[in-house]
Amino acid sequence: MISFIKGVLIEKDPTALLIDVNGIGYEVFVPMTTFYTLGDIDSQVSLYTHFVVREDAQQLYGFKSKVDKKVFQELIKVNGIGARTAIAILSGMDSKTLLHCIENKDYALLATVPGIGKKTAERLVIEIYDKLLKMANEIYAQTSGTTTTSQDSQAQQAPTSVVLANSIFNESVDALLALGYKQKDAEKMARSAMGDATTAAEVIRKALQGSIKSKR
């Protein structure tokens, strides 16, 4: 069982990282809420991890905090919710927002996540309600908001050319597809979130936040 990983960030794509640990490269899948907090390529990264073994694959999932890892582990215990859907949930909302959804039984907001319909949302609330409430103090203790990396800061100062804009759009669409959104929906979400964004991470964050707000 690999429950924590610390190494050098070699590759950084939305939802997937490559981390060098003493010469061995580990592919780690992460929710966007963790991706937003990452530093530049070649920087040190530390993540709490959960190792999933299936018949056709072995996958490592990483999280910025132990609390997010615990929430992920509770999510995948819910009937009908696998690791991919759990990652999609924690990409569209942080642990605090998820707790609010559970407390308020906000099925409509939960159903904005790809792969979750109303019935699955209702089952999720029923099965995870007590467990998440017990974790409420840990969840609320986490600092709110996301960390702006030096890479994001530098990107915000750089001019956005047509080529760069297309690259950002395509990368954003690919990330949304990886989270389970359909091609048409992913393109629409990315297009509406582009604005003056200068990084794919910024577009993805706005797209996911826009999806949540539209259901409120």
UniProtKB/Swiss-Prot annotation:
InterPro entries: DNA_helicase_Holl-junc_RuvA_I (IPR013849), Hlx-hairpin-Hlx_DNA-bd_motif (IPR003583), NA-bd_OB-fold (IPR012340), RuvA (IPR000085), RuvA_2-like (IPR010994), RuvA_C (IPR011114), RuvA_C_sf (IPR036267). Its main location: cytoplasm. Residues 164-216 are annotated as: Domain III. One of its GO terms (cellular component) is Holliday junction helicase complex. Residues 1-64 are annotated as: Domain I. Signal peptide: none annotated. Residues 65-143 are annotated as: Domain II. One of its GO terms (molecular function) is four-way junction DNA binding. Keywords: Cytoplasm, DNA damage, DNA recombination, DNA repair, DNA-binding. Residues 144-163 are annotated as: Flexible linker. Coiled coil: none annotated. Homotetramer. Forms an RuvA(8)-RuvB(12)-Holliday junction (HJ) complex. HJ DNA is sandwiched between 2 RuvA tetramers; dsDNA enters through RuvA and exits via RuvB. An RuvB hexamer assembles on each DNA strand where it exits the tetramer. Each RuvB hexamer is contacted by two RuvA subunits (via domain III) on 2 adjacent RuvB subunits; this complex drives branch migration. In the full resolvosome a probable DNA-RuvA(4)-RuvB(12)-RuvC(2) complex forms which resolves the HJ. The RuvA-RuvB-RuvC complex processes Holliday junction (HJ) DNA during genetic recombination and DNA repair, while the RuvA-RuvB complex plays an important role in the rescue of blocked DNA replication forks via replication fork reversal (RFR). RuvA specifically binds to HJ cruciform DNA, conferring on it an open structure. The RuvB hexamer acts as an ATP-dependent pump, pulling dsDNA into and through the RuvAB complex. HJ branch migration allows RuvC to scan DNA until it finds its consensus sequence, where it cleaves and resolves the cruciform DNA. HAMAP family: DNA_HJ_migration_RuvA (MF_00031). This is Holliday junction branch migration complex subunit RuvA. It comes from Francisella tularensis subsp. mediasiatica (strain FSC147). The lineage of its organism: Bacteria, Pseudomonadati, Pseudomonadota, Gammaproteobacteria, Thiotrichales.
